[in-house]
């Protein structure tokens, strides 16, 4: 029997192991999902304004961050591609560069949590599109694949497809551009690993 777990994708604890998981994380720099779903959330009384602010701070890909002594630089050691993107974007827009680091650091935490709850040789499928940050295309799937090796996974399969029906027609102005294809990344847990 399938069960939907509601909670934080970067910090959860389940009593049982599962054989597979699938996710579609937010695109970097794409939508403020908390803002987009704000009215529905308030109407259904699922959260109040204060709770929404707290949810937004914890959201994977949040743009609510304070650039300070940033403890998330270690993520750069997990992906040469991420390091390259970070260095290029930092010159143009320091805040956006740190948003990218935060996003991939959150994804690393998610990979570690899923690894801890997968059975040996379990499969984790991730559907994600690339993002365009300050004119630089970020191949999110590739960065996640590189990071996953540090979290006890191997890449088993990757393919992409063209998005034919952009059903979310929210005007993004010049922020991130139109995402035309999604990538499917299939990772397999290396037996005996726990991260």
Which residue stretches match the model-derived regions?
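Class I S-adenosyl-L-methionine-dependent methyltransferase catalytic core
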Residues: 1-22, 27-126, 130-195
